[in-house]
Amino acid sequence: MGKGKNKMHEPKNGRPQRGANGHSSRQNHRRMEMKYDNSEKMKFPVKLAMWDFDHCDPKRCSGKKLERLGLIKSLRVGQKFQGIVVSPNGKGVVCPDDLEIVEQHGASVVECSWARLEEVPFNKIGGKHERLLPYLVAANQVNYGRPWRLNCVEALAACFAIVGRMDWASELLSHFSWGMGFLELNKELLEIYQQCTDCDSVKRAEEEWLQKLEKETQERKSRAKEEDIWMMGNINRRGNGSQSDTSESEENSEQSDLEGNNQCIEYDSLGNAIRIDNMKSREAQSEESEDEESGSKENGEPLSYDPLGNLIR
């Protein structure tokens, strides 16, 4: 082989280099893949960032998916963020007054597991504008229906929705099959927060909403108790029970009467019922008639009596 014969050179005319078999070279394929990946990355109107602690499954992590799409940037521990930092370590809640900060500097989140918050070095991350999120319900596949258990994309979307940028919230959530369900699930509550101004007003709205939920829960419990009491004290059921008792007693009495009557009944050879008391009375009558006949005659001869009624033979 000659020296440098297998060395790959960049074509001068800009066309993809082909091998002896007419196919493009492997190096050209790699170059095209990198170009395709860069073209697929999206841009968001404001800066998005996260501190990723690899607590979640990469296939189900919403933050990692946003990173693959090129929508969010991963920060190192020790780096600070100038925009809104949605963090469990925040002091106040996100409010509509934060709109200017969001539009100028963006928003960031902490990508970690709710069960491993104690492992997160909050003193080494964050920024000047750390915020909590008010009461909202998760719609993601892991914590659906659970309050405050939002994942990364839900937290960012909630921040944008509260400050009034529903378009940004919808754009982020559109990359997830369940994403728009988050806005539908919290529609009424987000509209309430959007009508507030500062952090205190959002906090009051949150407390009023929680009191409303508590009241509805107590009402449901009281209604359930009343329904249980009504079922236990149903008059119709009691009446049916007494009627059944009386009917049973009547049946028992009738059965006892029949049994008593059966004791006085016998059957002849043809299966006809014969009452014993009637039979006995008939036998007694026949015996009396026989006695009378025997009294009127004895051995075919008439009987005579003295004046005192004694039989004279």
UniProtKB/Swiss-Prot annotation:
Enzyme Commission numbers on file: 2.5.1.157
Basic and acidic residues biased stretches: 215-228
Effect of R131A: Decreased aminocarboxypropyltransferase activity
Compositionally skewed regions (Polar residues) per UniProt: 237-246
Post-translational modification Phosphoserine, affected residues: S286, S289
Superkingdom in the source lineage: Eukaryota
Catalytic activity as recorded in UniProt: an N(1)-methylpseudouridine in rRNA + S-adenosyl-L-methionine = N(1)-methyl-N(3)-[(3S)-3-amino-3-carboxypropyl]pseudouridine in rRNA + S-methyl-5'-thioadenosine + H(+); N(1)-methylpseudouridine(1191) in yeast 18S rRNA + S-adenosyl-L-methionine = N(1)-methyl-N(3)-[(3S)-3-amino-3-carboxypropyl]pseudouridine(1191) in yeast 18S rRNA + S-methyl-5'-thioadenosine + H(+)
Region feature (Disordered): 1-30, 215-313
Subcellular location, record wording: Cytoplasm; Nucleus
Biased composition (Acidic residues): 247-257
GO terms for biological process, alphabetical: enzyme-directed rRNA pseudouridine synthesis; maturation of SSU-rRNA
GO cellular component: cytoplasm; nucleus; peroxisome
Catalytic EC class: transferase
Protein family: Belongs to the TDD superfamily. TSR3 family.
Role noted for this protein: Aminocarboxypropyltransferase that catalyzes the aminocarboxypropyl transfer on pseudouridine at position 1191 (Psi1191) in 18S rRNA. It constitutes the last step in biosynthesis of the hypermodified N1-methyl-N3-(3-amino-3-carboxypropyl) pseudouridine (m1acp3-Psi) conserved in eukaryotic 18S rRNA. Required for processing 35S pre-rRNA at site D.
Note: Present with 3610 molecules/cell in log phase SD medium.
Stated name of the protein: 18S rRNA aminocarboxypropyltransferase
Designated gene of the protein: TSR3
